[in-house]
Structures are given as C-alpha cells and as structure tokens.
C-alpha cells in the first residue's frame, strides 16, 4: 500500500509551517533517511526524510506553500511493484469506519479484578497452509498493521499506545489507519516518556487489558527496561501465579541505514536473558502477522522485535480468516544436506543469499529461521545438525553472549557426537555502530562471511 509522508512538526507546539522546497521529484527513487524536502517556520528550518525506501509517486503540496498544517500528507511513497494508479485506490482501501469523535487520549477503563495467570496461550500448533489457499502479496508493515487490526476487532481489551502511533500513524506507518477505525481511546499517542507509558501499559495489563506498546525504536526502550523486566517479566513469578501481564512491547530493533551507535542495537540477545519474557523476531510478512497475533493473545509479556529495513519488503501471506502461528516454533526455510544455517529477522537475508551462492559451488545448505528467540526451538536445530553435521549461525547483534553463542553451547551439550566440524558464529563486529556508511558496512555481517564460514565447516 502506498505510504503517505506527513508534514512533520519542528517542535511540540508547532501547528503549521512552510514547505520551502522539494529536493526530490516525482518518479525519483529514495532510501530510508534520504532528504526529500525542507520545511521552515519563522524560527527554524528542518529537513524531511523518507520513512522508507521506494519511489516518490506524487508530490501533494507545491514547493513554497505556506501554512501547511502538521500531519497533512505532503507526498506519497510507492513501494516495490506499486504504480501511480495505486495512489487513487488508497481511499477505497482505507478502513471502513466512521471518523472518530474527539476523545481524551486515554487507555480503556480497566476491569477491577486482576487477570488470572494463564500458563499457556490459546494458539494452535504450527498450521500447514492448506493447498490451494489464496495468497496476497503484502509488506511486513502491512502484515503487522493487519494483525493488530484483526485482534482489536476481535477483542475490545486490545489497544495500542506509543509515540506517534495515532495522529502520525506510526513513525514507520505500521499503525496506518488504526486511529480512523478504532478511535483515540484505543490508539493512544503518548509523550516521549518511555518509562512512563511502558509502566501505564504494564498496569493496564495487570488489570485485564491487552496493551500493545510501540517504541519508536527499541533503543528507546532502554529508558523503560525497569518496567519491562522488573514489572512485566517478574509479575507472574512474584505473585505466585495469581497475576500476569499480557502485554506486547513492539518496535524496530537493529541497524537501519546510518542511524549510528545509539539507534542501531539489536536487542534479541538482551531480552532473551530474562525469565518471564518471550522474544520474537520474524523475517517474513506471514510470520510477522501470525506471530504478532499470537503475541497479543499470549498471557505473558512478549518482546516483539521488528526491523526498519524489512518494513517495506514484500512477501506472500495466506488469505485466511485467522492466521496465527505458535510462538517458540522455528521454520525450515530451505532443506539441505551439507550444512545447517540458523538465523532470524534480517539475518535471514544474509543466509538466503549465501545459500544461493553456495548452491552454485555444489554445497547444499539447510536454512532454519528461528522466528522466536525465547523460547528457542532447539529440537528443530538439533535434528538438522544430526543430518548435516555442521552448523553456522548468523545475526547482526554483538558477538559476545549472542544468540549464536547460546545455540552453539546448547548444540555442543546435546548433539556433540553428531558434529563433523566446529560450530561457527557470524555476528556484527564488537564495536558501537559507526555513522559513516563505509564503516557501518564493515561493522555488519555480510554474505561473503557467511559463505566463507560454511565452506570452512565443510572443509572446502
């Protein structure tokens, strides 16, 4: 679906400004972070950046226009495979709902009694997609939005809150259209106070609601880590099973494009250390939708990690009435016999490209997409290792105490006799993420490293 680029605010009190000039034209291709325009007030000038990669489909506001209201659509960004004609269909594809009446931006009223702790989520085993199922091509962004919308329609206790989720429709447009359908009572804009609104979410969960707390980036969640770990994760244990916290903390994690050290950290390993949390990091749009629906229904707190670069990537998603995937079950993305590659999230892009290169060299690689970091589906990994005898892990996070080293440790403990070579782990470099593009590239894993690692364990 085409993405609207909105007029941003230079300050919390700004209501309108001047779109002084466009730096991109209709038809130009842009990447996330590219400067596309300049806006100004009588006090300051600011650059407007593209929220995702794509093509400028239409400029809605002419350069030099004064008095442009904040959050007014100023341009439309087309995703891969979309054409200018798709812009005209945006209105017909928008959620069919009445415009919400003005309401105070507050969470739904909570039930008086604490929610009873539930040890298991009501989610089916990993469903096989029935033969002949109609598939729809959609981006990860759209799949996440649809998952939230479906669960909000099914359960009035579900609501979403966070920075820019309502009026601005999400920093990355993941919540696009939700305010129009569900209103300000269930799509709640918050101040930039992560510790505060995370605590509000945990409290709402303790009293029976099912909050979805969006962080603009999981790097900002470090401000709220006390609420996530000490309040959400430990409540079930500390209450002796009398009270739970069914809450989802979601948002982008990991490197994007030149957002430097404080905005590029992968939190998969960080949160996987914590008893009481579930940690999910999907790669495909189908997994993003099915796992987010499961996370919203889960009686436990779930860390749902996304990736800014994957938001605009398109995948096939089954058109089923209620497509839900089980948390804690890995997926075999590709079968093979010579070596096992294990990854998750954006790390899958390296694994898939490496497998294609290795196939051309006569090496048949099996790829496992973990999908869930905690609880980890180690049996699927071990069964693959029993077949291939070789294991390489791939991720973008830091190398020390990484997801890969955890997998390596447990495979060594439980399947050592099946290994024909040492386990190798590929991860980001052990440095804060540089801002310079050339250095950022060096700090991240690459396909060549994965290819070399697989060849090494295969003694090629």
Curated annotation (Swiss-Prot):
Manner of cofactor binding, per the entry note: Binds 1 lipoyl cofactor covalently.
GO MF term list: pyruvate dehydrogenase (acetyl-transferring) activity
PROSITE patterns linked to this entry: BIOTINYL_LIPOYL (PS50968), LIPOYL (PS00189)
Catalytic activity: N(6)-[(R)-lipoyl]-L-lysyl-[protein] + pyruvate + H(+) = N(6)-[(R)-S(8)-acetyldihydrolipoyl]-L-lysyl-[protein] + CO2
Subunit organization: Heterodimer of an alpha and a beta chain.
NCBIfam families per UniProt: PRK09212.1 (NF006667), PRK11892.1 (NF008854)
Protein name: Pyruvate dehydrogenase E1 component subunit beta
Organism of this sequence: Rhizobium meliloti (strain 1021) (Ensifer meliloti)
Name of the gene this protein is made from: pdhB
């Amino acid at each position: 679906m085409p993405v609207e680029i909105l007029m941003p605010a230079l300050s919390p009190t700004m209501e309108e400004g001047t779109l002084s000039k466009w730096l991109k034209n209709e038809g130009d291709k842009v990447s996330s972070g590219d400067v596309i325009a300049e806006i100004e007030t009588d006090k300051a000038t600011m650059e407007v950046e593209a929220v995702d990669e794509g093509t400028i489909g239409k400029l809605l506001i002419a350069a030099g226009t004064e008095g442009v209201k904040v959050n007014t659509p100023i341009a439309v960004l087309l995703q891969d495979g979309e054409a200018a004609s798709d812009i005209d269909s945006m209105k017909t594809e928008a959620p069919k709902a009445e415009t919400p009446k003005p309401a105070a931006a507050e969470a739904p009223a909570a039930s008086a009694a604490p929610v009873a702790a539930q040890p298991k989520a009501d989610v089916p085993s990993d469903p096989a997609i029935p033969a002949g199922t109609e598939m729809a091509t959609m981006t990860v962004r759209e799949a996440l939005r649809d998952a939230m919308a479906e669960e909000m329609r099914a359960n009035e206790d579900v609501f979403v809150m966070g920075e820019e989720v309502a009026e601005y429709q999400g920093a990355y447009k993941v919540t696009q259209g939700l305010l129009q359908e569900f209103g300000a009572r269930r799509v709640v804009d918050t101040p930039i106070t992560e510790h505060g609104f995370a605590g509000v979410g945990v409290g709402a969960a303790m009293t029976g609601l099912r909050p979805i707390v969006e962080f603009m980036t999981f790097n900002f969640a470090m401000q709220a880590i006390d609420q996530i770990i000490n309040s959400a994760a430990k409540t079930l244990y500390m209450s002796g099973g009398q009270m739970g916290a069914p809450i989802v903390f979601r948002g982008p994690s990991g490197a994007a494009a030149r957002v430097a050290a404080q905005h590029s950290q992968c939190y998969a390993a960080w949160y996987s250390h914590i008893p009481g949390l579930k940690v999910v990091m999907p790669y495909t749009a189908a997994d993003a939708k099915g796992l987010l629906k499961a996370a919203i229904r889960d009686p436990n707190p779930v860390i749902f990690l996304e990736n800014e670069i994957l938001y605009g990537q398109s995948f096939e998603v089954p058109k089923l009435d209620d497509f839900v995937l089980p948390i804690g079950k890995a997926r075999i993305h590709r079968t093979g016999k010579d070596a096992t590659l294990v990854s998750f999230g954006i790390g899958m892009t390296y694994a898939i490209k490496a497998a294609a290169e290795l196939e051309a060299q006569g090496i048949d690689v099996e790829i496992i997409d973990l999908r869930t970091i905690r609880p980890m589906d180690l049996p699927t990994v071990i069964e693959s290792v029993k077949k291939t005898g070789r294991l390489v892990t791939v991720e973008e996070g830091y190398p020390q105490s990484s997801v890969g080293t955890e997998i390596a440790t447990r495979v060594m403990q439980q399947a050592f006799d099946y290994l024909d070579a040492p386990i190798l782990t590929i991860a980001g470099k052990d440095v804060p993420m540089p801002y310079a593009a050339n250095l950022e590239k060096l700090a991240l894993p690459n396909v060549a490293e994965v290819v070399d690692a697989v060849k090494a364990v295969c003694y090629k």
